[in-house]
A protein has these predicted regions:
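Short C-terminal tail/terminal secondary-structure segment
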Residues: 2-9, 114, 170, 249, ...
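Substrate-binding pocket helix/loop in short-chain dehydrogenase/reductase
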Residues: 118-122, 126-134, 229
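C-terminal substrate-recognition "lid" of short-chain dehydrogenase/reductases
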Residues: 142, 157, 237-266, 271
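Residue(s) in the substrate-gating loop at a strand-loop-helix junction
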Residues: 165
Length: 274
């Protein structure tokens, strides 16, 4: 993201504690930076230690610049190592975070199998790979939500954003486990929005198309595939991670205070609204 790029300001996000799973790279990292710019306290969970350190160093640089310009530094993201495929780690990290921070105002369930590893045809899927995709893409989403919602309820509300995909709505061939988990994400979002609504906890999802993260560009977005994507999209260009992250930030803010149970599509016009 260009340092000079103008970013909308959401006063309701100031001093809020935001937890982002898969927050060290791609859309998660873009979201972490945007929330830090809003003066939110950002907690990033990931297994990518080096990427997390690079993100922290980038925000430190932005913080110094912001302090020079405005007199106020940016909060520096805190990194927690967490392999979301391991439910015991999910539980222990959630407990540690609650002990250290008491309350998460905003939960971004972003961690997911990404890049080439998500592409397994039906005949190449094994019971182990099927279970792995469900642990990484869906199971942690449910159990982090389960762990953090009670404190949100006690505090009078909160916001949860689940990261989905349009893959189950287009003829996406060769990734049946992935598409199944992403369809389930919409179902979980709608179910939780009804269950948690009386507690003023909003639950929404963002459905991605092809997003030009560093990993996607390296492993998936070949010139031939990019040509196919652009042909399918209304916008004939790449969708950038920060463009997705801006929608996440809006949904997390009080500007979306009446929005819950919704799935926002950010796909350059590939399939449009659900």
């Amino acid at each position: 993201m260009a340092d000079s790029q103008q970013v909308a300001t959401y006063p309701s996000l100031r001093d809020k504690t935001v937890l982002i799973t898969g927050g060290a790279e791609g859309i998660g990292a873009a979201a972490a930076e945007l929330f830090a710019r809003q003066q939110s306290k950002v907690l990033i969970l990931d297994i990518a230690k080096d990427s997390a350190q690079r993100l922290i160093e980038r925000v430190e640089s932005l913080s110094r610049e912001n302090e020079r310009n405005t007199g106020r530094p940016l909060p520096i993201p805190l990194f927690y190592y967490c392999d979301v495929s391991d439910i015991d780690q999910v539980s222990s990290v959630a407990n540690r975070i609650l002990q250290e921070h008491k309350l998460i105002h905003i939960l971004i369930n972003n961690a997911s199998v990404a890049g080439a590893s998500s592409h397994k045809s039906t005949m190449s899927v094994t019971p182990e790979s099927w279970d792995f995709d469900f642990r990484v893409n869906l199971k942690h989403m449910f159990f982090f939500t389960q762990a953090l919602v009670p404190a949100m309820k006690e505090n009078g509300g909160g916001s949860i954003v689940n990261m989905g995909s349009i893959s189950w709505r287009i003829p996406a061939v060769g990734l049946p486990a992935y598409t199944t988990t992403k369809a389930a994400t919409m179902g979980l979002t709608r179910s939780h929005s009804k269950e948690f609504g009386p507690w003023n906890i909003r639950v929404n999802s963002v459905m991605l198309g092809s997003t030009a993260t560093e990993r996607q560009v390296k492993e998936i977005l070949t010139p031939a595939y990019r040509e196919q994507v652009w042909a399918a999209q209304s916008l004939k260009r790449d969708v950038r991670p920060e463009e997705v992250a801006r929608v996440v930030m809006f949904l997390a803010s009080d500007e979306a205070s009446a929005v819950t149970g919704s799935s926002y599509v950010v796909d350059g016009g590939w399939c449009g609204d659900p």
